[in-house]
Amino acid sequence: MTNKLRIYEFAKLLEIQNKDLMDILNKLNIEHKNHMSALEENDINLVLEYILQEKEKEKEHAEKRRERLPSHKEGRSGERQAKTFDEKKHTRHGEKASHPYDKRGEQKLQQKSQQDVRQKFDREKRERHQEAIAKESGKKLEGQERKAVVHDQKVVELFPQQEPEKRQAAKPKYEVAKEQKIEKRYQDKVAAKQKTEKATKHRKQLFNVDELTQEEVTVDREELEKIDKEVEDTLLEEEYLQEKHVRRGKKEKLKKRSKEQKEVLKLQTKTVQEEKKEEIVKIPEKITVGEFANLIGKPAAEVIKKLIMLGVMANINQEIDFDVASLIAEDYGFKVEKEIIKSEEEILLEDQEDPEETLQPRPPVVVVMGHVDHGKTSLLDAIRNTNVTEKEAGGITQHIGASVVEVNGRKITFLDTPGHEAFTAMRARGAQVTDIAVLVVAADDGVMPQTVEAINHAKAANVTIIVAINKIDKPEANPERVKQQLSEYGLIPEEWGGDTVFVNVSAKKKIGIDHLLEMILLVADLLELKANPNRPARGRVIEAKLDKGRGPVATVLVQKGTLKVGDYVVVGSTWGRVRAMIDDKGQRIKEAGPSMPVEILGLEDVPTAGDELVCVKDEKTAKTIAQIRQERLKEEKMQQSKISLDELFERIQKGQLKELRVIIKADVQGSVEALKSAIERLSNDKVTVKVIHAAVGAITESDVTLASASDAIIIGFNVRPEVGAMSLAEKEKVDIRMYRIIYDVINDIKAAMKGLLEPVYKEVIIGHAEVRQIFKSSSVGTIAGCYVLDGKITRTSNARIIRDGVVVYEGKLASLKRFKDDVREVAAGYECGMTFEKFNDIKEGDIVEAFEMQKVES
C-alpha cells in the first residue's frame, strides 16, 4: 500500500506555505486541485529532489559571490565618495543602484588601472627631472651610487612618496616581510598599534630628511616597476586579509550577539513559563466542564479529551469534582487552591473585625454557676438586692435571668444559670456568652458532680473562674477542704501559688459581697474587655418565650454594636423588627449597647435560646436569611428523622423495643430543652421515650390532634390548655398532664415506662359451642348457627375453630347475635349466631373454642 500525504500536511512537514508548495507542483506538472489534494509517493520524491537541487544551486551561487569578494579594502575616502556619487547619479537617472558587492571585482580592476597610469606618469616626471639634474652637474657616477642607495631603500623611500598621492587617507606602512606583517598584524592588537605609531614617526623622519637634503635620485625604470608591483601586491594582500578579518570579526560578534539574545529569550521564556506555572487557580468543590475550561483558558474540547484520558466521561455542561479538576489544572502547570464558596447567608451576615481605635471599654458579663441548692440565686439576690428565689417554683431557678448591677459607678452584667442537671445545655450556653464565671460552692457540702460539670463548661468556654465559697456562716463550714478539693481540678488559690481568686461569702448574711464585686472588677480590668458600640448590633439569645399578650419575647445579650428600636434583626431561623426593648428593671429603652441584656418584642416566631442575633439593613435581607435557615432546618430534620426511624424500625423488628411518645409544651424555650433532654435520657434497652413535638406556648387543639394520631401523651410545664383543646382531649381520650416542678415530670414518666414493659399472660378457656347450621349472607358472609355447650361465649373473646381435632382458624369474633340482636355474651344451653374476622370456611360439626389472655400478677 502506497503512502499518501495531503498537500497541507506535506507543506507542514517541509515548513513552507501551501501556496509555495503548490507553485513547485505546477513547475513539476504534478496534477492537483487544492491544498486538500493527496500526493502519491512518486510525486513526493519528485518534490523533494527539486527542493534539494534548488538548495544546491543556491549554495553554488553563494560560493561564487564569496569568490568575487574584493581583494583589498574598500574604504579609501576619495574612491568611496566617487562610488557614492556614481550610485546616486545612476539612481537619479532611473537606474537601480546595485549592491556594493555585486560589481566589486570590476571596481577593483578599474582602480588598479588608474593607479598604474598615475604611477607611470610620476615615474616619467621623476626621470626627466633626474636627467636634467645629471646634465647640469655631470656627475653620473654619483647618480649611480645614489641609484644603489635608492635600490637598497626602495620600499622606504618610494612608498612614502607614492602613498600620499595614491592613498589619500591610508595609514603609513613600514618595511617588514610579508609573512611577518600579516602574522603580527593579527596576533596582537596592542603590538599593531605600537608599530603603527612607530611607522608614523619613521615616516615623518624620512620626509624631513628628504626636505632638508633635497638629494638627487636616479632610479632605473624597470626596477621601479618591479618594486611598485611587489609593494602593491603586498598592500593588496594585506588589505584583503584585514578586510576578511573585519568581516569575520563582525560575523563572530553577530553570532555572539545572537547567541546572547537566544539565551536571554530562553531565560525570558523560562521565566514566563515559571510565572505561568506559578499561576494560581481557585476551583470550587463542583464545577461544570465549560466553566472549568474558561477558568484555565483552554478549549472545552481539549479539557474533555483530558477527562476521557482520566476515565471520566463528561460533556461541557456536566459537573466534575475538585479532585478531577485539580488533576487537569496541575497537568497544565497551574497551582490549584480550593475555593470556599460562601452561601448567600454568609455573605449577607459576614462580620468584619473592628479596628483597634473604634473599641471602647465595656462592662463584664458574669455568670453564676454551681451545684443545685449551693446558693447561686441567693448570692445573686444579695448582689442585686432583689428577692428572686422565693418566686421560683420549689425554690429552684427554672430559667436564665439577666440583671445589671452598678458598683462604684461601673456596671456588671450578671446571668443566673439553673443548678439542676437537666439544665446542662442552658448552662453551657450561659458560659459561651460570658467573660467571668463565679463558681458557687457550699462550704459545708464541698465539690459536687454539677460543680465539676460547671468547671468543665467554664474551661471549655475559656472563661476566667472566680470561686465564691458560700454558706461560711454555718458551723460545719470548711473552706479549706473546698480549696483542697478544687485544686484537684486545676483551680489553685492565689495564696497557694495559683492564679484562681477565692472569696469567702455568705449570701444569707451578706458577708464578703463587696469583696467579691471588687474581685470581679479587678479581673475584668486584667481582661481589658472592649467592644465597638458604633456598628450594627450582634448578640445572643439568653432566653425566649411566647407571651400571651406580647407575642414572642426574647431576652438578648448585646455583644457588639448598639441595638436600637426599629432595627431589622435575624435571630436563628426567625426575623423581625424591634418594636420595643425592655431592660432588666422593666423599663422601656430605645437602645442597648455592648454587654447589656434586654427583652425585645417584634419577632415573627419564638427563637431558640443560644441563637445569634444579627442586625441587618432592611426587611428584605432579614426575610431572605430567615427563609434560607428555615429551609435548611427542614432538610436537617428530615435527614435526622429518617435515620432515627431506620434505627427504631430495626429494633422494633427484633422485638426489643417499645416506645412512649411525648409532646412537651412549656412557658420558655429553656424549659422545653431541659425537659426534652431529661425525658429522653430516661430511655432504656426495653422502652424508648421519644419527644415527637416540643414548643413554647399553651396546649392547642393541634397538639391534641397530633397526640391522638401518634398515641402520645402531652406534658404541660407552667402552661394551661386552651378551652377547645381540653374538650377535644376528653373526646379523643388523650392524656394531658400539667406540672410546675421538673422532678414530678420525671417521676411520672418513669412510672409510665414501667407500665409499658411486657407483662406475662396465660390463656384461659371460657366456653365451647358447636356449629349446627350454616347461613349465607351477601353482606356479612357465612353465619354459623351455634349451640353453647359449656361456659360462655363473649363478644371480646378470642375464638379457635377445631375440625376433627385440628385447629383450622384462630382469631377474633366479628359479631355475636341472638336472633337479630347484638349481645355481649351467650351462656351455656342457648343458641346464637357468630361470624369470624376474615374467615368464611365454616362447616357443620365444627367446635368453636372461646378463650381470653389474662395477665399474671408478678
UniProtKB/Swiss-Prot annotation:
PROSITE patterns documented for this protein: G_TR_2, IF2
Region (G1): 370-377
Alphabetical list of SUPFAM superfamilies matching this protein: Initiation factor IF2/eIF5b, domain 3, P-loop containing nucleoside triphosphate hydrolases, Translation proteins
Disulfide bonds: none
Signal peptide positions (record): none
Stated family: Belongs to the TRAFAC class translation factor GTPase superfamily. Classic translation factor GTPase family. IF-2 subfamily.
PANTHER family: TR-TYPE G DOMAIN-CONTAINING PROTEIN, TRANSLATION INITIATION FACTOR IF-2-RELATED
Name of the protein this chain belongs to: Translation initiation factor IF-2
Name of the gene this protein is made from: infB
